[in-house]
Design a protein with these regions (language model features):
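Alpha-helical scaffolding segments of alpha/beta enzyme cores, especially the outer helices
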Residues: 21, 76-83, 125, 269, ...
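Nucleotide-activated donor-dependent transferases that construct or modify glycoconjugates
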Residues: 2-11
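Short catalytic helix/loop segments, enriched in acidic residues and glycine
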Residues: 19-27
Length: 310
């Protein structure tokens, strides 16, 4: 089982905090570096080059991080990927698709699913679902022989590890915070009342939108930069809070009212990491950075007192 997270950045110096956080959370939960990787590209690269690089990965699952500046390129890329990797599950996530996941699935038939809202836990559980699917050989026909071969080659330690991982894996309809295309012949239970039928009657497809996932504590978000190299040549994105208390009609951030803050103890420790690594530019991506004066001033004070002149 192999999954690839894909970031399509505006420029090389930019980075993708969303992809980093999903990767770091799943790795901390026990997913190995052989099972999950992330790849970063830019919208200025030739699409054929990106497609070639992703094709070489031969992933079972591929997830794209979707924003306003890359959504059209990602749709085109994902459509082409489906042609050359028809057995690969393709999932979208990010602010450009999260707010209307059912419609995104209806309009893009090559998609397997869309993550709705925060993705750390949902992505991990979806990844575990696909691991179980492979272990049980509940696969698309073209992969059955390959799966049998892989299973027979596993060592006893690998089998034991997989058994432990599969103990509490959920089915898709039990995973909160996702939308997915219903497989024919499969009966849904908890998610049944969230079904949306496709407008295209000839396709006879149904979209399942599961229950919203409760917001996680920001202290449970894994700091993604500890093991990363070459931070001196990139713009680093960092968040100390999520959510927005305001209701601006033009902004997607107004959808999530639950403002949460990362504990100041963690924030200071992570700011010190950036200072020690001599990162030249850190951009705070909090929706409303100054909505809590005490929180904001503590951050400024720490930076002022520990300035390293970079």
């Amino acid at each position: 089982m192999k999954a690839v997270l894909v970031a399509l950045n505006a420029k090389y110096i930019h980075s993708n905090l969303g992809v980093y956080c999903l990767y770091a959370y799943s790795r901390k939960k026990g997913i190995s570096s052989d099972e999950l990787v992330y790849r970063e590209f830019t919208i200025n690269q030739e699409m054929d080059d990106i497609l070639g690089a992703l094709y070489k990965e031969k992933p079972d699952l591929i997830g794209f991080s979707c924003y306003i500046w890359n959504i059209e390129e990602i749709k085109e890329m994902a459509c082409e990927l489906h042609k050359i990797l028809p057995d690969t599950a393709i999932w979208f996530g990010g602010p450009e698709v999260s707010y209307d996941a059912g419609k995104v699935l209806e309009q893009n038939p090559y998609l397997s699913g869309v993550f709705v809202g925060e993705g750390e836990v949902s992505f991990y559980e979806v990844l575990r679902y696909y691991q179980k699917k492979e272990a049980n050989q509940v696969l698309l026909p073209k992969k059955e022989e390959w799966a049998k071969k892989e299973q027979t080659e596993q060592t006893n330690d690998q089998k034991k590890s997989n058994a432990q991982k599969n103990d509490s894996i959920k089915t898709l309809e039990q995973i909160e915070g996702i939308a997915y295309r219903k497989q024919s012949g499969k009966e849904d239970t908890e998610a049944q009342k969230f079904i949306k039928s496709s407008d295209n009657a000839s396709e006879k497809t149904e979209i399942i939108i599961t229950k919203a996932r409760p917001c996680m504590s920001l202290d449970d978000v894994v700091f993604p930069y500890h093991d990363m190299k070459d931070l001196k040549n990139r713009i680093v994105y960092y968040e100390t809070s999520r959510g927005c208390p305001y209701g601006c009609s033009y902004c997607l951030s107004s959808v999530e009212k639950n403002v949460r803050f990362r504990s100041m103890e963690l924030v200071k420790k992570e700011l010190q990491f950036f200072l020690d690594q001599k990162v030249p530019q850190v951009k705070f991506v909090d929706r409303t950075f100054n909505c809590n004066e005490k929180h904001t001033m503590e951050i400024w004070q720490y930076i002022k007192e520990h300035d390293n002149g970079i």
